């Protein structure tokens, strides 16, 4: 079952990719994406001169829009170009170029008269990939996950308002977090656009209530690194990072094209109708980037297939590799990885499935290694907000009931209105 989807693929000597984007049950598509295999290619006489493969940089990005699609579309068309124009990029400092490029994208939108009254915004999860290194920049709650012999290694972390570090910046800038949202409105704390939260002239762009300033992760590629997945929260709200990696790995073992694996994952996540209340109804965009590491496409597929056949790393069950099979759906997540996993070996690589604390995300679980889960996904403040609202409403209702009991005639006259007010409060809570 597909709802207004589009897919594409490509490859060069360094990597191959497949992507798919689906509108889902939303009335409009607000996601955008970018896939550029040669970021430094020079245009001469109407044709492009390719960069030497040993020096080539590829760029991939997912931009999940909210409040409209204009900022997301601008980001999809321009972020990679803006990053490539940064002074740091020319000097080979890709990490700084990504940070500067995100902020420069905000400035470019502000300076464009077409966007003078624009209120929309978007997340940005992007990756620059060389022959032996990956840079991941993230602002918002789209996510980048590396598949390492079937194990999910997060290369980005969601920016949520209830995270202690994010909440501290929001408060210092004059904002607040209510029900897990910035000023009771925005469900993420970093984004491109959203200029209504960036109006403090005395503060730097990094200090605003909402900032486009990204976190950047740098990863040295090893032979165990098989692929990178970049996707918006339409995927991650339905599946854990580990389940996505296992699903992708099974599709590769079954020799499916990468864009087809993306399509199957989206069909798997898509709710059967629009009545589920959000999960499985969102726009979805997903990119899988295969890390060739000196291999041909065929050799890369064969290597992963052999690893799966030999039980080298976790993988989804064989039936998940069948083209007609759509996987577990949003109500049935994959189980944890096998108990014979070599924990010490994984620690030596800088991540660990077992050592991470289990964070509940939607209907699945997410393992966030080497991070403080209270800082990243602390729901306690949000829960306190909800509790305080409920206690306040209950106190009001108790006071109203006491007053009405003193005046029976008044109680009879106002009983209908009190019921309506209570219903509205319950709905809003």
From Swiss-Prot:
Listed SMART domains: PP2C_SIG (SM00331), PP2Cc (SM00332)
MF (Gene Ontology): metal ion binding; protein serine/threonine phosphatase activity
Top-rank taxon, per record: Eukaryota
Residues covered by the PPM-type phosphatase domain: 16-291
Residues reported in the UniProt entry to bind Mn(2+) 1: 64-65
PROSITE patterns the UniProt entry points to: PPM_1, PPM_2
Compartment list: Cytoplasm; Nucleus
Keywords carried by this UniProt record: Cytoplasm, Hydrolase, Manganese, Metal-binding, Nucleus, Protein phosphatase
Alphabetized Gene3D superfamilies for the sequence: PPM-type phosphatase domain (3.60.40.10)
Disruption outcome: Leads to increased phosphorylation of the HOG1-kinase sakA, and increased expression of genes positively regulated by the stress-activated p38MAPK cascade. Leads to increased phosphorylation of the cell integrity MAPK cascade MAP kinase mpkA. Alters the composition of cell wall constituents, and leads to impaired biofilm formation and increases sensitivity to the cell-wall stress inducers Calcofluor White and Congo Red. Decreases virulence in a neutropenic murine model of invasive pulmonary aspergillosis.
Catalytic function, reaction form: O-phospho-L-seryl-[protein] + H2O = L-seryl-[protein] + phosphate; O-phospho-L-threonyl-[protein] + H2O = L-threonyl-[protein] + phosphate
Biological function: Dephosphorylating regulator for many key proteins. Dephosphorylates sakA, to negatively regulate the stress-activated p38MAPK cascade.
Protein name: Protein phosphatase 2C homolog 2
UniProt gene name: ptcB
């Amino acid at each position: 079952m597909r709802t207004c989807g589009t897919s594409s693929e490509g490859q060069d000597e360094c990597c191959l990719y497949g992507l798919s984007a689906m509108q889902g049950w939303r009335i409009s598509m607000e996601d955008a994406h970018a896939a550029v295999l040669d970021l430094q290619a020079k245009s001469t006489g109407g044709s492009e001169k390719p960069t030497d493969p040993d020096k080539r940089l590829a760029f991939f990005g997912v931009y999940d829009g909210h409040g409209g699609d204009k900022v997301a579309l601008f980001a999809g068309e321009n972020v990679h170009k803006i990053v490539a124009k940064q002074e740091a990029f020319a000097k080979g400092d890709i990490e700084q170029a990504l940070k500067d490029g995100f902020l420069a994208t905000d400035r470019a939108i502000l300076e464009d008269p077409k966007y003078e009254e624009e209120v929309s915004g978007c997340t940005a999860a992007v990756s620059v990939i060389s022959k032996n290194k990956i840079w991941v920049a993230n602002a918002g709650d789209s996510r980048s996950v590396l598949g390492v012999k079937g194990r999910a290694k997060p290369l980005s972390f969601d920016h949520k308002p209830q995270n202690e570090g994010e909440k501290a910046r929001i408060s210092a800038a004059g904002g607040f977090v209510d029900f897990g949202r910035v000023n009771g409105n925005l469900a993420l704390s970093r984004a491109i656009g959203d200029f209504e939260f960036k109006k403090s002239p005395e503060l730097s762009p990094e200090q605003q209530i909402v900032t486009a300033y990204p976190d950047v992760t740098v990863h040295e590629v090893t032979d165990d690194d098989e692929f990178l997945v970049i996707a918006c929260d339409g995927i991650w709200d339905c599946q854990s990072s580990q389940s996505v990696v296992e699903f992708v790995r099974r599709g590769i073992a079954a020799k499916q094209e990468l864009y087809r694996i993306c399509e199957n994952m989206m069909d798997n996540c898509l709710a059967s109708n629009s009545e589920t209340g959000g999960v499985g109804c969102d726009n979805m965009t997903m990119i899988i980037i295969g890390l060739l590491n000196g291999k041909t496409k065929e050799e890369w597929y064969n290597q992963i297939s052999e690893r799966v056949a030999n039980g080298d790393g976790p993988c989804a069950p064989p039936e998940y590799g069948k083209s007609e099979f759509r996987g577990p759906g949003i109500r049935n997540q994959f189980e944890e990885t096998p108990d014979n996993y070599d924990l010490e070996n994984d620690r030596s690589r800088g991540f660990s499935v077992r050592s991470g604390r289990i964070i509940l995300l939607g209907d699945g679980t997410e393992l966030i290694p080497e991070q403080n889960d209270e800082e990243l996904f602390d729901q306690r403040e949000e829960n306190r907000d909800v509790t305080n609202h409920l206690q306040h409403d209950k106190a009001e209702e108790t006071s109203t009931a006491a007053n009405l009991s003193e005046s029976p005639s008044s109680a009879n006259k106002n009983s209908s209105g009190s019921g309506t007010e209570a219903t509205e409060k319950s709905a809003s809570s």
